[in-house]
């Protein structure tokens, strides 16, 4: 049976209540959902009426993922977010009154003008709300995005530098790890109650199958990964003609289940290379030892026995580290020794900023 069903890819709460009922009804009718299936509906507070909420609950939704991003009024106006912090907080308190509904919010760090007290207050508000989970993500400023255009034209402050974003991430770790009501699920996900399981996000990063439905959706099956057609008109036309609306498909690499397991283990950390490799009868501990030693030296990992535990710096770099670990193992298995496991110089971020921040982390830990 299907363990997690996720409605995302944008703002599903923008749908009318009648459409929400239709799509949830179709899913429950046609998909073999587990009795305890996590059914997540993604969206935002703006326009999410009581009628839409009832449609979600009637359709079996047991988890809401709300993109709050920030509670700061100035930052929200700058990002063209319509609802006031007071309204958002009030609505989240109302949503939190539903006993069998996990309410999870996303916070972003790195917005222009968000550093210091602004981010500290965002974390404090989130920690005290009657919700079930919080995700803390770094803001990505894409080259052709409206935000980047505004920054380049001087209409708003620059986004946080990498070093500043890393410090903001570290502050979120300190806030929630020291709070008695919260416990950690992954590097970026925190739970306050047992209602928050975060199943979809954890399963999707590992070797589990993930069936994608809808324009632009991506997933994988038996190691084959693919994406649905991204242009809505073309996707709709292909569906009407009975064609599979596949935009691109990739065949599985050698040892793909091992690679997926390794990546998800590094991302969720701590991890045991001997145990991971043993589950697949492949020795990955010895070939990856130089990589791990370099990361320990860089202040990204700590080792105790067979267990590698990411430091706060390693937790911040987890996506890059997971990617580089699988790339390193792939090249080692294929006898390609050209790989250099340096998560700083090979990342998309500024090497100087990253090195400067890692030095400050090392000093703090000393």
What are these regions (language model features)?
Residues 1-282:
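C-terminal scaffold of the Radical SAM
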Residues 217-366:
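Charged, E/D/K/R/S-rich low-complexity terminal regions of large eukaryotic assembly subunits
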């Amino acid at each position: 049976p299907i363990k997690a069903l996720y409605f995302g890819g944008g703002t599903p709460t923008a749908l009318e209540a009648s459409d929400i009922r239709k799509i949830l009804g179709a899913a429950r009718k046609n998909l073999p959902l587990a009795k305890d299936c996590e059914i997540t509906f993604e969206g935002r507070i703006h326009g999410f009426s009581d009628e839409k909420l009832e449609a979600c609950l009637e359709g079996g939704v047991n988890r809401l993922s709300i993109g709050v991003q920030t509670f700061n009024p100035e930052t929200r106006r700058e990002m063209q977010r319509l609802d006031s912090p007071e309204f958002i907080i009030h609505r989240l308190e109302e949503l939190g009154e539903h006993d069998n509904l996990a309410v999870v919010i996303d916070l972003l760090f790195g917005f222009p003008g968000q550093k210091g007290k602004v981010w500290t207050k965002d974390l404090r508000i989130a920690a005290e709300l009657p919700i079930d989970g919080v995700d803390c993500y770094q803001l990505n400023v894409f080259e052709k995005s409206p935000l980047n255009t505004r920054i380049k034209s001087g209409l708003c402050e620059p986004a946080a530098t990498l070093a500043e974003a890393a410090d903001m991430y570290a502050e979120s770790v300190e806030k929630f790890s020291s709070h008695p009501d919260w416990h950690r699920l992954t590097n970026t996900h925190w739970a306050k109650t047992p209602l928050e399981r975060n199943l979809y996000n954890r399963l999707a990063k590992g070797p589990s199958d993930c069936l994608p439905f809808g324009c632009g959706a991506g997933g994988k099956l038996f190691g084959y990964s693919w994406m649905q057609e991204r242009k809505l008109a073309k996707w709709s036309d292909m569906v009407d003609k009975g064609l599979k609306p596949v935009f691109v498909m990739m065949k599985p690499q050698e040892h793909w289940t091992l690679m997926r397991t390794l990546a998800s283990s590094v991302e969720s950390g701590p991890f045991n290379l001997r145990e991971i490799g043993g589950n697949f009868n492949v020795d990955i501990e010895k070939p990856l030892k130089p990589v791990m030693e370099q990361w320990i030296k860089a202040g990204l990992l700590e080792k105790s026995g067979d267990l590698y535990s990411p430091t706060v710096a390693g937790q911040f770099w987890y996506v890059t580290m997971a990617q580089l670990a699988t790339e390193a193992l792939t090249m080692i298995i294929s006898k390609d020794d050209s790989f250099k496991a340096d998560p700083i110089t090979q990342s998309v971020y500024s090497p100087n900023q990253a090195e400067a921040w890692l030095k400050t982390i090392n000093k703090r830990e000393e």
